[in-house]
UniProtKB/Swiss-Prot annotation:
One of its GO terms (biological process) is proton motive force-driven plasma membrane ATP synthesis. F-type ATPases have 2 components, CF(1) - the catalytic core - and CF(0) - the membrane proton channel. CF(1) has five subunits: alpha(3), beta(3), gamma(1), delta(1), epsilon(1). CF(0) has three main subunits: a, b and c. GO terms for molecular function: ATP binding; proton-transporting ATP synthase activity, rotational mechanism. Produces ATP from ADP in the presence of a proton gradient across the membrane. The gamma chain is believed to be important in regulating ATPase activity and the flow of protons through the CF(0) complex. PANTHER family: ATP SYNTHASE GAMMA CHAIN, ATP SYNTHASE SUBUNIT GAMMA, MITOCHONDRIAL. One of its GO terms (cellular component) is plasma membrane. It is a peripheral membrane protein. It comes from Francisella philomiragia subsp. philomiragia (strain ATCC 25017 / CCUG 19701 / FSC 153 / O#319-036). This is ATP synthase gamma chain. InterPro entries: ATP_synth_F1_ATPase_gsu, ATP_synth_F1_gsu, ATP_synth_F1_gsu_CS. It is found in: Cell inner membrane. Belongs to the ATPase gamma chain family. Its main location: membrane. Keywords: ATP synthesis, Cell inner membrane, Cell membrane, CF(1), Hydrogen ion transport, Ion transport, Membrane, Transport.
């Protein structure tokens, strides 16, 4: 058993760590509130983009846009959104496990895989995988929002160009979904081809509405230019929304991880204090025994 001085030193060390984790919990809680505001602010834009792209796509169903229609799948791409920092529990590893299941299915079907990694954790993880080709990386920094958006647009352009050129035949995005402060879950969604996103019921409904003239658009220029630009904006909106939602998930997961660490530190301190009292009691008992033995010898 450790002596009393060692135990006191351990108690002080754990208390210092507890102060750090407590402060990190408060910082994460503050950042989480800001991240949730950003996430909620971008959602109406993403939903509007969804509605517009569905309507325009159905009204232009005969236009051969490369982003719209299925083709034989020989190679797929994944945009994986992770964090740049750790200390957020199992947020990243749960996401990687989720996307790896889908990647493994494609590899088993002899479909090659390209990855665009957003966040240093994803870049490091997928760089170690032999069967996966990392073609682009980017980072999101909430302190440099404009710079981060430019970097992410550059990485996204790499994937879009590969899809347009026929180098990949399908594009997915993997990120975390914010369910609540204490729950975040990984999700995988299709970005391209766009028609894969629509259910059969949506396709049927939109075709009927378009044929009946329930809605229509007047194009300032030709439909080709408008639809190409709109598809790119739609995909950028999806990625931007996923990144902001993932940022909220990161701060929520970090807050809970630091709270658990702070609570565990309290349990460790209580146990160390109990050990200290046992050692101190044993020392007192030993001293009393020595005094009694000395008195008996006299």
């Amino acid at each position: 058993m450790s002596n009393a001085r060692e135990i006191r030193s351990k108690v002080q060390s754990v208390k210092n760590t507890q102060k750090i984790t407590g402060a990190m919990e408060l910082v994460a809680a503050s950042k989480m509130r800001g991240a949730i505001v950003k996430m909620n602010n971008v959602r109406p834009y993403v939903e509007s983009a969804n509605t517009i792209i569905k309507n325009v796509t159905m009204a232009s169903i005969d236009y051969p846009n490369p982003y719209l229609f299925d083709r034989e799948v020989k190679r797929v791409g994944y945009i994986v959104t992770s964090t740049d920092r750790g200390l957020c529990g199992g947020l990243n590893i749960n996401l990687f496990k989720h996307v790896l299941k889908d990647i493994k299915k494609n590899l088993d079907d002899r479909v090659e895989v390209d990855v665009c990694a957003i966040g240093s954790k994803a870049a490091t993880f997928f760089a170690k995988l032999i069967d996966v080709n990392v073609v682009a990386t980017a980072h999101y920094n909430d302190k440099d929002n404009e710079g981060s958006i430019r970097a992410i647009r550059g990485a996204l352009k790499v994937m879009l160009d590969r899809f347009t050129n026929g180098e990949i035949d399908r594009l997915y995005m993997s990120s975390n979904q914010f369910v609540s402060t204490i729950k975040q879950k990984p999700k995988l969604q299709t970005l391209l081809p766009i028609q894969d996103i629509f259910s059969k019921e949506e396709l049927k409904t939109n075709k009927e509405q378009a044929s009946k003239g329930h809605w229509d658009y007047i194009y300032e220029r030709d439909i080709e230019e408008v639809l190409n630009a709109l598809c790119i904006r739609y995909i950028e909106a999806q990625v931007r929304g996923a990144i902001l939602e993932n940022a909220a998930c990161e701060q929520a997961a970090r807050m809970m991880a630091m709270k658990n660490a702070t609570d565990n530190a309290s349990d460790i301190i209580d146990q160390l204090k109990l050990d200290y009292n046992k050692v101190r009691q044993a020392m007192i008992t030993q001293e009393l025994a020595e005094i009694c033995s000395g008195a008996a010898a006299v």
